């Protein structure tokens, strides 16, 4: 038996992956609702033409057949929608960031505790990237010894003409560290097997978009836990010649070797995605990881059915967002920002 889904909020293209991955695993979708006519809606209708539009979100929340609500609304509205969904008896898979303030996070924690529902953030740079699955397998096999550091680089293409007004309002998107930085925090905690971490330093800035002072186009974080250290850099500087939206990379340093992931492109010329480079005492090789599985979605289906936490522990999800929010709040504000 699979799940019945509802979609609320189509303000980010990530909903394509959220819904598409679940439908590919046999789930069905009863309907969707979004405010207005956001830019990603046209692509959503092309991909999912047979799913009906609901007249209001309450229609989906009141439907007893719906098990799981998928959310990709404007980031600042996601927490409230998730809480309404959980109080209506639904589990939730939301796009990142799952919330934009510490007060929202506290309210989400309270709701999960009271309702016993699942609040899961689809950190797509792990959950939708086969290379990360393969890297985790290699680590589990002992290929690089004990992980002691990660360096996560998350460049993104700005695509300025396509961006809505909320994209330039840091109160709406939460800031660059809350938003795209949360991906990298998730991977650091996961790969180092850290339950928590300290934000040693963080910074945000606007170096290339003076006409949009609400946009943070650069951010960095230094994390440290009892298991290791992590450096994170995120930006909106992907140049036009790159054939994809970002040259996302992750280097995982172990005591007996290292792994480098070139997730979406290999600029040295290898075709395709999901390039894993492994170097240890016996091997120095490139691995095509494009055929690795994406277990998050299958496990989330099982978690909804069995009330388990195999896709992602709930505490991990909360901790990722808390660290992202704390890094954002304490970040040194570099040049070019409103109220810098």
Across the structure, where does each feature detected by a protein language model lie?
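N-terminal Rossmann-like dinucleotide-binding module
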Residues: 1-48
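Mid-domain beta-loop-alpha active-site segment that forms a flexible
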Residues: 122-130, 161-197, 214-217, 316-317
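C-terminal helix-rich "cap/oligomerization" subdomain common to oxidoreductases
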Residues: 1, 7, 33, 68-70, ...
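Beta-loop-alpha module in the N-terminal Rossmann-like domain of NAD(P)-dependent dehydrogenases
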Residues: 47-111
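C-terminal glycine/acidic-rich active-site capping loop/insertion
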Residues: 6, 51, 241-242, 247-315, ...
């Amino acid at each position: 038996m699979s799940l019945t889904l509802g979609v609320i909020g189509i303000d980010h293209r990530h909903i394509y992956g959220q819904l598409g991955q679940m439908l590919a695993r046999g789930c069905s979708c009863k309907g969707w609702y979004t405010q207005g006519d956001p830019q990603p809606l046209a692509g959503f209708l092309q991909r999912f033409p047979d799913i009906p539009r609901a007249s209001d979100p309450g229609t989906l929340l009141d439907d007893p057949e719906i098990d799981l609500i998928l959310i990709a609304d404007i980031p600042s509205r996601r927490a409230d929608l998730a809480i309404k969904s959980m109080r209506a008896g639904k589990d939730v898979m939301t796009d990142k960031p799952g919330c934009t303030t510490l007060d929202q996070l506290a309210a989400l924690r309270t709701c999960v505790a009271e309702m016993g529902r699942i609040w899961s953030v689809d950190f797509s740079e792990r959950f939708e990237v086969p290379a990360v699955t393969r890297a985790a397998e290699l680590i589990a096999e002992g290929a690089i010894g004990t992980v002691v550091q990660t360096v996560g680089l998350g460049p993104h293409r700005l695509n300025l003409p396509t961006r809505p007004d909320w994209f330039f309002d840091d109160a709406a998107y939460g800031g660059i560290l809350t938003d795209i930085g949360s991906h990298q925090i998730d991977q650091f905690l996961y790969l180092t097997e850290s339950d928590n971490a300290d934000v040693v330093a963080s910074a945000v800035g606007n170096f290339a978009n003076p006409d949009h002072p609400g946009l943070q186009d650069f951010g960095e974080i230094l994390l440290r836990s009892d298991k290791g250290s992590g450096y994170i850099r995120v930006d909106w500087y992907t140049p036009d010649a790159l054939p994809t939206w970002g040259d996302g990379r992750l280097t995982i340093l172990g005591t007996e070797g290292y792994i480098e992931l070139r997730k979406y492109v290999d600029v040295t010329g290898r075709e395709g995605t999901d390039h894993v480079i492994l170097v240890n005492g016996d091997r120095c090789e490139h691995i095509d990881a494009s055929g690795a599985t994406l277990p998050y979605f299958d496990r989330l289906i099982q978690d909804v059915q069995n009330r388990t936490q195999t896709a992602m522990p709930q505490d991990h999800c909360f901790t990722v967002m808390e660290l992202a929010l704390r890094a954002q709040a304490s970040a040194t504000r570099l040049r070019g920002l409103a109220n810098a």
